[in-house]
A protein has these predicted regions:
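Hydrophobic H-region at the start of alpha-helical membrane spans
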Residues: 1, 37-41, 144
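Alpha-helical transmembrane segments of multi-pass membrane proteins
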Residues: 2-14
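Hydrophobic/aromatic residues in alpha-helical transmembrane segments
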Residues: 5, 48-52, 102, 151-152
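Juxtamembrane helix-loop-helix connectors linking adjacent transmembrane helices
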Residues: 12-91, 108-109, 186
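Transmembrane helix-loop-helix hairpins at the membrane interface
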Residues: 75-186
Length: 186
């Protein structure tokens, strides 16, 4: 459904679907480099935010709260070797919709890229947070999603393609799932 809605959104904005996969030829920096830097930036900012949260509220049990998020909990039921497939696929689809369809459709109809970034980030954070059960989950998932969306919009706007943000988001999701200690308990 998000793919169909994204395609329709791009059609309404008169942005060719294939265009969101085309790297701007005038780009002076490698999209691969930007993908890696977006991933590193997203992870670094998420870890920084988590450490600030733990400094403010040391008794906040972030790992157990995050492991109880429904999609993370269900991902942990798969063997570790294949558990990465679900977050990887979801991240790619989310990027196609939020940074690909929404961001490029908004900028395609003349909305200022920074306003488009703010709107897309609010939409993305809401999409992530409505799936959680408590405040700790909402704060941690919300803050990480905010950083990921801002970086993704920035890179998509800079490169003219959704591919670097898609790669960064997919690696980000897989990184956090693969580094989850809960697999050791299974």
């Amino acid at each position: 459904m998000p793919m169909l809605f994204g395609w329709l959104l791009l059609r309404i904005a008169h942005v060719p679907y294939a265009e969101i996969f085309t790297v701007d030829e005038a780009l002076q920096i490698s999209p691969v480099y930007l993908s890696v830097m977006s991933f590193v930036g997203g992870v670094t900012l998420s870890i920084l935010a988590t450490n600030i949260m733990l400094t403010i509220a040391p008794k906040m049990d972030i790992p157990n709260n995050i492991n109880k998020v429904a999609w993370i909990e269900s991902t942990m039921e798969f063997p570790k070797q294949i558990a990465w497939i679900f977050p990887f696929s979801s991240a790619c689809i989310e990027e196609l919709f939020f940074r690909g369809a929404c961001f490029f459709a908004f900028t395609g109809v003349g909305i200022n890229p920074y306003i488009a970034m703010i709107v897309v980030t609010i939409m993305f954070v809401f999409n992530q947070v409505y799936l959680v059960d408590n405040k700790v989950q909402a704060i941690v998932i919300g803050v990480g999603s905010m950083f990921l969306s801002i970086l993704g919009c920035f890179v998509a706007g800079l490169t003219g393609t959704v591919i670097p943000s898609m790669i960064a988001h997919a690696i980000y999701a897989v990184f956090f799932i693969r580094s989850n200690d809960s697999f050791d308990a299974v």
